Regions:
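Substrate-binding rim/cap in mid-to-C-terminal beta-strand-loop elements of soluble/periplasmic
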Residues: 1-44, 48-63, 80, 147-150, ...
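A structural signal for well-ordered alpha-helical segments within the folded catalytic domains
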Residues: 22-29, 33, 44-52, 104, ...
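Short, solvent-exposed turn/loop segments enriched in Gly/Ser/Thr/Pro and often Arg
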Residues: 46-47, 73-75, 121, 184-188
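Bilobed periplasmic-binding protein-like "clamshell/Venus-flytrap" ligand-binding domains
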Residues: 63-66, 177-188
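Intrinsic low-complexity/disordered segments
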Residues: 69-70, 169, 184
Length: 188
């Protein structure tokens, strides 16, 4: 993700590769850190600096390294039927011109070393909130052995949804998703 074009990298690891998780949200903090501006970045800015990985690409030695990557994606579903597998939903090509109040489902995903899990939840597009008790579908893909570097078919590891075969893993990853994305319950 980050390449220093100078012939000898000041960080000591020219061309090094890391297995650390990185998200787009980390880019701003990383660039600010590399520019020496990290102390100027407000605490309200999300993300973590990936600059320490340039010094030591071994993410297991970095206490701030992420254990997972998270994402969310709205889908514009036409005539979705509850309890059908995700692959038989009729999905529109693009949400670009879809009115906000027509977005009925939000997919929340977590990617760990061994798994990618997505939960498709009913979405209240007016309140901008997912209904965490209304799970429409789940997807779980085993990425054991996927180092992210081996050239393979685009979706070699995402051909078989194994969610029904791994209920304990689904519960664990769902709890992590909810902890990351779900808002705290309102206090009275």
């Amino acid at each position: 993700m980050i390449r220093d074009p100078r012939p000898s990298a000041p960080y000591g690891h020219s061309g090094a590769v890391t297995a650390a998780f990185a998200e787009n949200i980390d880019i701003y903090r990383t660039l600010a850190d590399l520019a020496g501006l990290n102390t100027e970045v407000e605490s309200s800015v999300d993300g973590v600096s990936l600059a320490p990985l340039l010094v030591n690409p071994d993410h297991t030695q970095n206490p701030k390294a992420k254990h997972a990557a998270f994402s969310q994606q709205a889908h514009c579903l036409m005539d979705p039927h509850t309890n059908l597998p995700i692959d038989v939903w009729t999905v529109a090509d693009s949400c670009t011109m879809t009115p906000r109040n027509s977005l009925g489902f939000m997919g929340y995903s977590i990617r760990t070393d061994d798994w990618r899990f997505t939960a498709w939840l009913q979405w209240d597009a007016i309140a901008l909130r997912a209904n965490w008790s209304a799970i429409n579908a789940t997807e779980l893909y085993n990425h054991t052995g996927d180092d992210g570097l081996t050239i393979s078919a685009l979706d070699d590891y995402e051909n078989d949804n194994v969610a029904q075969l791994n209920p304990d893993i689904v519960r664990s990853l769902m709890a992590q998703l909810r902890g990351h994305f779900a808002p705290a319950e309102p206090r009275e």
